[in-house]
Amino acid sequence: MTNANVDATQLTTKPSEDGFYMPAEWAAQQAVWMIWPYRPDNWRSAGAYAQATFAKVADAIGGATPVYMGVPQAFLAEAQTVMPSHVTLVEIDSNDCWARDTGPTVVVNAEGECRGVDWGFNAWGGHNGGLYFPWDKDEQVAAQMLKQHGFARYSAPLILEGGSIHVDGEGTCMTTAECLLNANRNPDLTKEQIEALLRDYLNVKQFIWLEEGVYMDETDGHIDNMCCFARPGEVILHWTDDETDPQYPRSKAALDVLQNTVDAQGRKLKIHLLPQPGPLYCTEEESKGVTEGTGVPRTAGERLAGSYVNFLITNDRIVFPLLDPATDDIAAQKLQEIFPEHKIVGVPAREILLGGGNIHCITQQIPSGK
């Protein structure tokens, strides 16, 4: 166990000026970060079910990549008993456990040096549709993770969650208008200004804008639940063939965009379709275990934004969510076809979905820089 309650060195330049860029998720990784789930108004039984699931995710990742977990001081003893022994527990305070969105975006240069981008955070919408209040501890998470690795820090003047962007490492950034252009994120910035900041801090050249993400995704349609890069020139899209399903027009509109765009290198995209599980709904029993608080209520009968696209690429592994016995095997087979060199590891992940996200949302990779 280590303590990371000290800020990282802050830089006054921008990554693009210094020759740094965000690498793709398939680049070599030295670590993956997670955060302990405990929030009783989001996780049933004060996180007990989620904690057991997070332990399984950490174990699956740990076979390929070292895992760090940020844990508030009050929960360290409990985390030591629940988490696999290979997980490095680091004392970090947080309001909730979405490492993808509160953790840093680590950028690298040609020499393999790593630095971190610390984005602004307002709990997915602040006082205009955000998911809880306060979020002051979450705002400090990225700097503490960077301190643990000794990486210098860029502070970006943009409210942005890691789950709202995907890059191919070759100049292309994919995102959704539903999230990045939402009035509850950066209301004073135009699309062009947001693109300019992403060019500065990710060092990308080309943008692929999908209009919307997954139906009922409370993050306002994060790209990481909807579509991701598999490798340069290839994407994986969340899909349903059911034209009566509310997801269909969203996925169809995304497919139309993807079929008619090119990436930063001028390539047309190869598009893989990953089937939608379910539809899945929160049960009465599942909603009962969540207490009332400042978080969004978890209601029985509510449709869950389940998606197999919400997986993590970590070195030679793909860690993906098992969500529906009717489609889990199909998703695993499809992922193995897309990633023939990777080990495909499924983890039962309904408990993460009940809290509003999935495996990609609760993890944040630290590239090796190699």
From Swiss-Prot:
Record Gene3D superfamilies: L-arginine/glycine Amidinotransferase, Chain A (3.75.10.10)
GO molecular function: agmatine deiminase activity; protein-arginine deiminase activity
Enzyme class: hydrolase
A family per Pfam: PAD_porph
Active-site residues, Swiss-Prot/TrEMBL: 361
GO terms (BP aspect): putrescine biosynthetic process
Similarity comment: Belongs to the agmatine deiminase family.
Name under which the protein is recorded: Putative agmatine deiminase
Source organism (scientific name): Shewanella sp. (strain ANA-3)
Organism lineage string: Bacteria, Pseudomonadati, Pseudomonadota, Gammaproteobacteria, Alteromonadales
